[in-house]
Amino acid sequence: IAQATEFIESKKDGFDEYVEEKGTSLSGGQKQRLSIARAIVKKPEILIFDDSSSALDLVTEAKLYKAMREHINDTTRIVVAQRVATAKNADKIIVLDGGVIVDFDTHENLLASCEVYQDIYNSQLKREGDSNE
C-alpha cells in the first residue's frame, strides 16, 4: 500500500536492512513511504496525512492513494495537501484561502464553482500536468 516494497527489496539486506538514525541513508520519499507503512500497519481508526507525500513523485503518490482507497476502507483518512492531484479523489475537499475556509465540496463541484480552487488547479495543471490517477 505504501509503495515501499520495491525500494526495500532493492536494499542489500532487504527488509533486514539497518536504517541509520534519522534515516540518513534514505531519500525523502523513502522516509515518507516507510512512515506511512508504519502508520498503516497499526490499523488506526483515523489516519492524518499532513503533506506526508510531498516528497513523492506524482506517479508514486497516485499509486499510494489508489492502494489506500482499495485496501483501507475501515479507516478515516484526513489528508492535508497542497497538490490538487493529491486531493481530487477525496470524498470532500476543504479549500482554504489565507487560513479561512472558502469552500467545501467534491473536486468536480469545486472546479465548477470555486474560483480559489480553479486558480490553484489551473496553476498546478500548467506546472505538473493533469494526473488522472
Regions found by a protein language model. Give the residues of each.
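C-terminal portion of ABC ATPase nucleotide-binding domains
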Residues: I8-G14, K66, K88-E133
